[in-house]
Each structure stands twice: as C-alpha cells, then as structure tokens.
C-alpha cells in the first residue's frame, strides 16, 4: 500500500522545487550591517525591508512582512540624503564658492563622490559608498566594439552620452586643480576619468528627484538630484506603482506603495514608463517582458521599401516632418504603432489621392489599396529588422565565445536584442493577421 504524503513532506517538496528561485537574505553581510548602523545614527527607523539577492534582478530589497496598498515602505530622513547642500557644507564648499564660472549641481555631486571615495575609511559616507557598485553597465561604460552592436538609435544616443561626459570631465579639470590643498596625492590621480565616470554613473543611475533650494555658488542648472542610501537598493519593475516624494512635514523622503506586496517577495519601484533602450541608456539594464518596450523605426527605414519612382515622395516626407511624424515610430507588443502606420499610409498614398493627406493624418481610411500597401511596407520593414537582429545575435554569440572579458557586456546587448526580436515577431504575426483580409 502506497504511503500517503503528509503536509511536512509536501512543504519540503515545495521548498526543494522553489530553492532555485528564492531570494537569499543578505542583511547579515558586514557592509549592510554597517549601513544599518550608519542610517540609525542619522535617525533612520528600521523598516520591514531587508537587502536580498534575487534570481533575475540581483540585489534588491525583500519585505519581511506583507505590505498594504498606501503603506509607507521607506521613510528616509533628510540627514541621510546626499545633496548639493551636503557638498557645500563639506571641505569642498569653500573651493566651490570661489570657482568661476560656477560649477553645476551635477559636477558638485560627482566631485564629492570622487573625493569621499578617495578618502576611504576617513569618509563619513564610507558605509554608503561601500555598497555602491564598483562599476556600471551604462553604454557610456561599454567598450566601443560592444556599443557598435546596439540598435542604431541607441548607439547614437550612447555616443552622445559618452561625448557629454567626456566634455564635462575635460571642462572641470581646471576646477579640480584648485582642490590640490585637500589631497596629499596629485589631484590628477585622484580625479581620473575612470573615477569621474564612476561618480557620474552613480548619480545618473541612482539619484532620486528632489528639488533643492537654489545654491548661489552653483550654476543655474536644475538642482534636482539626491542620492538616497538604502532606498536606492530598490529595483525597477514596469508593473508596479509607487508614490515617491519628500514630505515637508516629516522632513523625510518617502516611498508609498500603490499596490500590495506579499511577505518575502521582492519590493519594486517604477523608474517611469521607459522602453528598454531608455532603461539601458540611463540605468544599464533591460527589463524582460516590459510592456513599454518597443523597437524604433528610423526615418531612413521608412522609405527603404517605397518605389523610387514616386515623384511626390519628397513632398510626402516634408509633410511628415512638418507634422512631427518622423519620430517615435515603433513596433510594439501590439504591432506597429498608430504613428508608424499613419506615416506609412501617407507615404503610400496613390498620386490621384495625394490631396487627401490631411485625412490620413487624422486617421481616416482612404482606400483599401492604401491600407494594403502600407501594411505590406510595414511587414517588409519588420522582416528586415528581424533579419538584422538575427545577424547581430549571431555576431554576439561568436564574440562571447572568443572574447571572455566582454561576456557580461555582450550579454546585456544580447538581452536587449532578444527582447526586441520577441517584439518584432509579435508584430509580424499581427501584421499577417491585418493583411489576411486583403489576400
């Protein structure tokens, strides 16, 4: 007779089955113990959130108890926030006040981070600095041969980002030289490009929005960035909603959940309704099954499959430019966007119906021929981008085999391209369905 399994055995089986997907509590690690002490000294009250390692998202925060909708999950006192006010009150303050033209709020924060990182054990912010990433995966940090594998729109933005950071560093070297009295080592070795890039990425990827009072000694650029220790361990999910703001009454930066979260689950915040190219550019990661993910279509790709003999093509392109229809043209999980199809419908207008272009922009159907032709062009564009994506993925696979040092960077590109491939395949299927009635 077969023995019946009891509750204990069933529970054991469930634990074994889920052991590979469970979070690992990391609150026992020395760096997090020190961070807790540091936060407590600054009046931070303990929360039901603890650092943990999660499969898929890496390090994040886990809830020790169920969170209810509307509950404050983190309340970080002003004394824990790293702002430009922190910088001005530090030993850097007198030098910043003297420098002309005034440094920007961003440069002030970056300078402080480099200085405090260099100070090591002498830094009052050591407990926070120790839990920050040693390196980042934003495109500005990627090797040129890896950046070349990014989709064209993202590659262009990545190159702009790199140039912007390099320009900021170069223009700041004169200011850095005035800080020599603060350091025993040559200031050039302290404020290296590598150290500055780390600081810039720290601010760019981890800062929360906090409008600070205007500092007269800083430039007029918006002063809206604050680093928030512990709070910045929260990972992004496009599927959650939270309310984050500075509470003027409590003088705390608060995050309030807008949905429930079960005990021992990872707690997320949402950085915004960003697509994956934006997430990779600004934060250095890709979100799987991101509902906001899309594949952009360039203006050049729009006309690639149109008949070269169309005498009205130049006029059509001008109309699209004048009415803002040459940007934000995308394929998404639900197929080609309305803007993409509208642009293609106008480009595919027959000569005798060209005068109806205003109706096209208003979303009106002009003719079955126009509908079929524009959908056909969309299908060709989609197929072309699918082929290109497959080719890049093959190249990434080959490079991962031959260049071990670049594997982590290549895996990031692979994740982006794979997600975009899934979107394109979903769009291709939808386009086939839309074209079926015309066949």
Swiss-Prot record:
Lipoprotein recorded as keyword: no
Main localization of the protein described in the UniProt heading: cytoplasm
Disulfide bonds: none
Catalytic function, reaction form: L-lysyl(4)-[histone H3] + S-adenosyl-L-methionine = N(6)-methyl-L-lysyl(4)-[histone H3] + S-adenosyl-L-homocysteine + H(+); N(6)-methyl-L-lysyl(4)-[histone H3] + S-adenosyl-L-methionine = N(6),N(6)-dimethyl-L-lysyl(4)-[histone H3] + S-adenosyl-L-homocysteine + H(+); L-lysyl(20)-[histone H4] + S-adenosyl-L-methionine = N(6)-methyl-L-lysyl(20)-[histone H4] + S-adenosyl-L-homocysteine + H(+); N(6)-methyl-L-lysyl(20)-[histone H4] + S-adenosyl-L-methionine = N(6),N(6)-dimethyl-L-lysyl(20)-[histone H4] + S-adenosyl-L-homocysteine + H(+)
Disruption phenotype: No visible phenotype in normal physiological conditions. Increased proliferation of bone marrow mesenchymal stem cells (BMSCs), impaired BMSCs migration and differentiation potentials of lineages of cardiacmyocyte and smooth muscle cell. Conditional deletion in adult mice improves the survival from radiation-induced hematopoietic failure and thymic lymphoma. Extends survival from radiation-induced thymic lymphoma is likely due to slower tumor enlargement in the thymus.
EC number: 2.1.1.-, 2.1.1.364
Residues of the SET domain: 47-272
Root EC class: transferase
Residues annotated to bind S-adenosyl-L-methionine: 271
Cellular component GO terms held in the UniProt record: cytosol; nucleus
Tissue expression summary: Expressed in the forebrain subventricular zone, in quiescent neural stem cells.
GO molecular function, one term: histone H4K20 methyltransferase activity
Alphabetical list of InterPro entries matching this protein: Rubisco_LSMT_subst-bd, Rubisco_LSMT_subst-bd_sf, SET_dom, SET_dom_sf, SET_MeTrfase, SETD3_SETD6_MTase, SETD4_SET
Biased composition (Basic residues): 1-19
An annotated GO BP: positive regulation of tumor necrosis factor production
Localization (cell): Cytoplasm, Cytosol; Nucleus
CDD domains recorded: SET_SETD4
Summary of subunit composition and partner proteins: Forms a ternary complex with TBK1 and ZNF268; the interaction with TBK1 is ZNF268-dependent and leads to TBK1 monomethylation.
Protein family membership: Belongs to the class V-like SAM-binding methyltransferase superfamily. SETD4 family.
Reported function: Protein-lysine N-methyltransferase that methylates both histones and non-histone proteins. Via its catalytic activity, regulates many processes, including cell proliferation, cell differentiation, inflammatory response and apoptosis. Regulates the inflammatory response by mediating mono- and dimethylation of 'Lys-4' of histone H3 (H3K4me1 and H3K4me2, respectively), leading to activate the transcription of pro-inflammatory cytokines IL6 and TNF-alpha.
Entry protein name: SET domain-containing protein 4
The organism of origin for this protein: Mus musculus (Mouse)
């Amino acid at each position: 007779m077969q023995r019946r399994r009891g509750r204990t055995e069933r529970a054991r089986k469930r634990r074994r089955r889920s052991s590979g997907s469970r979070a690992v509590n990391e609150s026992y690690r020395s760096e997090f113990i020190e961070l807790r002490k540091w936060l407590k000294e600054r009046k931070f009250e303990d929360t039901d959130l603890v650092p943990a390692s999660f499969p898929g998202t890496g390090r994040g925060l886990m809830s020790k108890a169920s969170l209810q909708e509307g509950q404050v999950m983190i309340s970080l006192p002003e004394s824990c926030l790293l702002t430009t006010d922190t910088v001005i009150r530090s030993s850097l303050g007198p030098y910043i006040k003297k420098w002309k033209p005034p440094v920007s709020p961003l440069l002030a924060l970056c300078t402080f981070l480099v200085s405090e990182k260099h100070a090591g054990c002498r830094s009052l912010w050591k407990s926070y600095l120790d839990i920050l990433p040693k390196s980042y995966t934003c495109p500005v940090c990627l090797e040129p041969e890896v950046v070349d594998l990014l989709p064209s729109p993202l590659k262009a933005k990545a190159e702009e980002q790199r140039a912007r950071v390099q320009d900021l560093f170069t223009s700041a070297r004169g200011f850095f030289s005035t800080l020599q009295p603060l350091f025993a080592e040559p200031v050039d070795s302290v404020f290296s490009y590598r150290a500055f890039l780390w600081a810039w990425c720290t601010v760019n990827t981890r800062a929360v929005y906090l409008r600070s009072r205007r500092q007269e000694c800083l430039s007029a650029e918006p002063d809206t960035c604050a680093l928030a220790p512990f709070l910045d361990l929260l990972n992004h999910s496009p599927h959650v909603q939270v309310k984050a703001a500075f509470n003027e009454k409590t003088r705390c930066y608060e995050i309030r959940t807008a949905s429930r979260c079960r005990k021992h689950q990872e707690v997320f915040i949402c950085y915004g309704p960003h697509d994956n190219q934006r997430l990779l550019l600004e934060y250095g990661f890709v979100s799987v099954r991101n509902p906001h993910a899309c594949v952009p279509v360039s203006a050049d790709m729009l006309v690639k499959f149109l008949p070269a003999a169309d005498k009205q093509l130049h006029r059509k392109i001008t109309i699209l430019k004048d009415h803002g229809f040459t940007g934000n043209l995308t394929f998404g999980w639900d197929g080609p966007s309305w803007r993409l199809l509208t642009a293609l419908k106008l480009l595919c207008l027959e000569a005798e119906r060209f005068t109806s272009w205003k109706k096209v922009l208003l979303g009106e159907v002009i003719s079955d021929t126009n509908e079929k032709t524009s959908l056909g062009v969309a299908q060709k564009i989609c197929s072309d981008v699918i082929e290109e994506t497959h080719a890049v993925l093959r190249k990434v696979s080959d490079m991962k085999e031959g260049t071990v040092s670049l594997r982590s960077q290549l895996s990031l590109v692979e994740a982006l391209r794979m997600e975009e491939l899934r979107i394109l395949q979903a769009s291709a299927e939808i386009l086939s369905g839309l074209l079926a009635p015309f066949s």
